[in-house]
Regions:
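Short, surface-exposed linear patches
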Residues: 50-52, 65-69, 93-101
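Small/polar-rich, solvent-exposed N-terminal microdomains that initiate assembly or binding
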Residues: 1-56, 89
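Mid-chain, well-packed structural core segment of small domains
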Residues: 64, 69-92
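Short, charged interaction patches at domain edges and termini
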Residues: 1-14, 50-57, 61-65, 105-138
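Short, compact, well-ordered microdomains
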Residues: 85-107, 112-118
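Broad gene-expression machinery/nucleic-acid interaction feature
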Residues: 40-42, 67-69, 122-124
């Protein structure tokens, strides 16, 4: 079995733009860091619901249905990088990777946020997709 979360992380880290702004340790699963603890950019991949069986044939499930939320946090530092623009660029790149590499389409998009107390931009989207059970993913 292959962990679908690791497959998402690998797809993100194999992208030139994402790997320029994030290290593997900056991609978290399920646990959202405290805003005060974020010192660099962070991505959080959160599974909204456990995989559910779908697309049945002869009463046997053919696919797993997934729903993930991915949040991109960009720390605005005292440099020439526009954190707001970068957070939008990164979440759009995540969306492209999720579709082209994994076949997960955008399910929902959220209002971008800025936490002034911590100079932190956040962009979030949800992605839904199916994988055939025989692909060995879980």
């Amino acid at each position: 079995m292959t962990d679908i979360l690791m497959k998402i992380q690998d797809a993100l880290m194999n992208d030139e733009l994402i790997s320029k702004h994030f290290e593997r340790k900056d991609i978290k699963f399920f646990v959202y860091p405290n805003a005060n603890d974020i010192i660099s950019n962070v991505i959080v991949i959160d599974e909204i619901f456990s995989p559910s069986r779908s697309d049945f044939a002869d009463n046997n499930p053919l696919t797993y249905d997934y729903l993930f939320q991915i949040d991109v946090f960009v720390k605005q530092k005292n440099n020439n990088v526009n954190g707001s623009l970068l957070s939008r660029e990164l979440i759009l790149r995540v969306s492209k990777i999720m579709w082209q590499e994994l076949g997960f389409g955008e399910f929902n998009s959220f209002k971008p946020e800025y936490n002034q107390d911590f100079n932190l931009y956040q962009a979030s989207k949800q992605f839904r997709g199916k994988k055939y059970i025989d692909e060995g993913l879980l």
